[in-house]
Amino acid sequence: MSLVPMVVEQTNRGERSYDIFSRLLNDRIIVLSDEVNDATASLIVAQMLYLEAQDPDKDIQFYINSPGGSVASGFAIYDTMQYVKCDVSTICMGMAASMGAFLLAAGEKGKRFALPNSEIMIHQPLGGARGQATDIKIHAENILRTRDKLNKILSERTGQPLDKIEKDTERDFFMSADEAKAYGIIDDIMVRRK
């Protein structure tokens, strides 16, 4: 994101300016609005650890609008979400695809939401390997293990039987917010903040 708006607040000492994401962090809001990669994962993990250190008893709100991305980077975020003492509430705005959908489902049960026009998409992990036949075989076996791990976690998070998850993730599987709620990826649809 190249343009980041600034917020100016009045304090008893004068004016104070923040970039918008720092201001949202003060309200315990983290935003993923890009692909999941090492850089975005490092930022999100650091923000979650910071918010836990600030107050381990207050929820973190994690807004997701992501096409997905790296499985390893996504697992870094997922594991941190499970590790911190704070409940992490997830909210999909726009699209949560691939690893974005996985992270949406990883929120605290009962606190996973989507806005009404959100789209959610799950599928199996993508991969590619080059090199000697033995190396390609090693990579193929690894991606199959990764697929099985992702499917098992999605089954646990959604309550869907593992064989249904395996069938549905064989190809791109798109859902509306209503369908994602019925599937168990989210718990409710947010129309207006209360």
Swiss-Prot record:
Keywords: Cytoplasm, Hydrolase, Protease, Serine protease. Its EC number is 3.4.21.92. It is found in: Cytoplasm. Its main location: cytoplasm. It is an enzyme of class 3 (hydrolase). One of its GO terms (cellular component) is endopeptidase Clp complex. One of its GO terms (biological process) is protein quality control for misfolded or incompletely synthesized proteins. Belongs to the peptidase S14 family. This is ATP-dependent Clp protease proteolytic subunit. It comes from Ruminiclostridium cellulolyticum (strain ATCC 35319 / DSM 5812 / JCM 6584 / H10).
